[in-house]
Amino acid sequence: MTDSKPNFQKAYINANEILVSSKIITNFPYSATKLIKEQSSIVCRSFDKAHKYNVDIEAFGSDSAVIMNLDDKYIIFYNQNEMPERIKFSMLHEFGHKVNNHKFIVTSDEVYGIAEVETNYFAAQLLMPEQILREFQKRGRRIDKYFLMTIFGVSEQAAIKRIENLNQITWERSQ
């Protein structure tokens, strides 16, 4: 990743390709673990199981989740003590690093920040697809954080951020 800003279009397209190809996603919310398993060879394990792989999770600086390449096998380790909604987002975020072809050895804070924003957008699109939200709006539904939390099974933080991003997207597309 050498771009100077997040490639939202790439993240959007990659998420949409998964949304339309998945047989797991028949309604919302869905199982992130099952989706990752269906779409890749990535294995998901809790932080509690990291020691079985001789992995020190604390060395990676994430309290929620991390993706690692161990002997050419990708594993997403997640914090089982988080809320289920947070775990789901974190797992799909880490999955997004692989899908969006991010480097796992980051050369700078700027590159890391760009990758993080891009994968947050990817995870949000998988969990709360823009197309579905726009259709709800066309049908008169008010899209607020409570609606997103209830229908899509996401955390309050993810719902608020998605609404902010959707408002930004609407403004940018009208330019």
Where do the model's predicted regions map?
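Active-site hotspot residues in diverse enzymes, especially metal/ion-binding acidic/histidine motifs
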Residues: 1-175
